[in-house]
Amino acid sequence: MDADLDTLLADLQRRMDGAMETLKREFSGLRTGRANPALLDPVKVEAYGTLMPLNQVATVAVPESRMLTVQVWDRGMVNATVAAIRDCGLGLNPQPDGQLIRVPLPLLTEERRNELARAAGKYAEGARVAVRGVRRDGMETIKGFEKKHQIGEDQGRDWADRVQKLTDATIKKIDELLVEKEKDIRQV
């Protein structure tokens, strides 16, 4: 039966880790005071008749703490790339210079920082909800084992405790990520 528990815990851990990875990806798209190439990950460029991720038509670099540069590989894509960056909703104003596009990051206003912190909180809450959903699935699986008399009540409680500990640890990691991200956002 311990093999079943190990399998269950491994599956739950994998699913909870997936929620954490999603949260990290969402956090990377939130703008902080510092330049980060991941900031432009959500940007899609109209290229060759389809929308392509920016990283498939250009190289993004960070030459300074408040500046991104986008080196477009195809000279004909510069205007489309500038438009995509400008229209991505991040409040950026790209400046083309040949095939190089400079993207200065303006200082965040206090209001914008608060909006970003709220967005980070929403992302974290979404991750917590996902983790709790995984926990619920695990608990239902344990109850199913108990109903089929594959495990006893005591063993079921032990398994449930281990699932709860896994859940608590993951939610603690989410909270730590949120605190760190909010600190980054609020840093002037």
Swiss-Prot record:
Keywords: Cytoplasm, Protein biosynthesis. GO terms for molecular function: ribosomal large subunit binding. GO terms for cellular component: cytosol. It is found in: Cytoplasm. InterPro entries: Ribosome_recyc_fac, Ribosome_recyc_fac_dom, RRF_sf. One of its GO terms (biological process) is cytoplasmic translational termination. Its main location: cytoplasm. Pfam families: RRF. PANTHER family: MITOCHONDRIAL RIBOSOME RECYCLING FACTOR PSEUDO 1, RIBOSOME RECYCLING FACTOR. Belongs to the RRF family. Responsible for the release of ribosomes from messenger RNA at the termination of protein biosynthesis. May increase the efficiency of translation by recycling ribosomes from one round of translation to another. This is Ribosome-recycling factor.
